[in-house]
Amino acid sequence: MNNADLYRKSNSLQKRDALRCLEEHANKIKWKKIGDRVIDLGCADGSVTDILKVYMPKNYGRLVGCDISEEMVKYANKHHGFGRTSFRVLDIEGDLTADLKQGFDHVFSFYTLHWIRDQERAFRNIFNLLGDEGDCLLLFLGHTPIFDVYRTLSHTEKWHSWLEHVDRFISPYHDNEDPEKEVKKIMERVGFSNIEVQCKTLFYVYDDLDVLKKSVAAINPFNIPKDILEDFLEDYIDVVREMRLLDRCNNNVGESVSIKFNYKVISVYARKLCLSLM
């Protein structure tokens, strides 16, 4: 997941869903009259951070995009970092530095939190990033076929050693029958108020197998060497076929193949109220 240029070319699903989330929930954000401090967690190449700016007041104070990958941050700073927008390395599951604590009025995160094993630690850090009266808007994966494909491949002799720790890279909510309840419980425990959690089923159609393979390669969390990556992607497609996720349709040119994924996304809006108002 460190190839920023490949991610930029292959993140159409992530950008589409971030845009939908903002269209649906941006009106809930409690913007200040001037000088909003905003942080985007898991910014990757910075392209979604650019989308976020469209929904922010023009007189915002600063926008900080963060990612655990140094390569992603370098790419984002080069292509999107200017003026009041900057990017830095941050592990949201790690310790926050003093300059980050209570340093923001709004926290956004799109397609990142499902990679985090310690969910309570991540939500507590989000809470601590916010100043009083701050709020957050988050979007992450629940159940999705990509995780089932990973699991299937991890049980094969060929790929077991490479995918030995597969559960580290599967959403904590993939097998949860009531993710809304679980997320809300964690956030209440951390201290959030006005919590709204929605789990929705969406679908996305990849136009052909090559597009799917590039998308899988762009977010591949496993340390698979380049010389066998194509082999891994071919086996990935074979599992997709076995799971009957391929839709074949005929047209005037000939037979084409599209891949339709149904998956669940979890959206969250919540606030950090001042203690005197609680």
Swiss-Prot record:
It catalyses: (2E,6E)-farnesoate + S-adenosyl-L-methionine = methyl (2E,6E)-farnesoate + S-adenosyl-L-homocysteine; juvenile hormone III carboxylate + S-adenosyl-L-methionine = juvenile hormone III + S-adenosyl-L-homocysteine. It comes from the Eukaryota. Keywords: Methyltransferase, S-adenosyl-L-methionine, Transferase. Specifically expressed in the corpora allata (CA). GO terms for molecular function: farnesoic acid O-methyltransferase activity. InterPro entries: Methyltranfer_dom, SAM-dependent_MTases_sf. Signal peptide: none annotated. Its EC number is 2.1.1.325. GO terms for biological process: juvenile hormone biosynthetic process; methylation. The keyword Methyltransferase applies. Pfam families: Methyltransf_31. The keyword Iron-sulfur does not apply. Belongs to the methyltransferase superfamily. O-methyltransferase that transfers a methyl group from S-adenosyl-L-methionine (SAM) to the carboxyl group of juvenile hormone acids to produce active juvenile hormones in the corpora allata, the last step during juvenile hormone biosynthesis. Also able to methylate farnesoate to methyl farnesoate. This is Juvenile hormone acid O-methyltransferase. It comes from Bombyx mori (Silk moth).
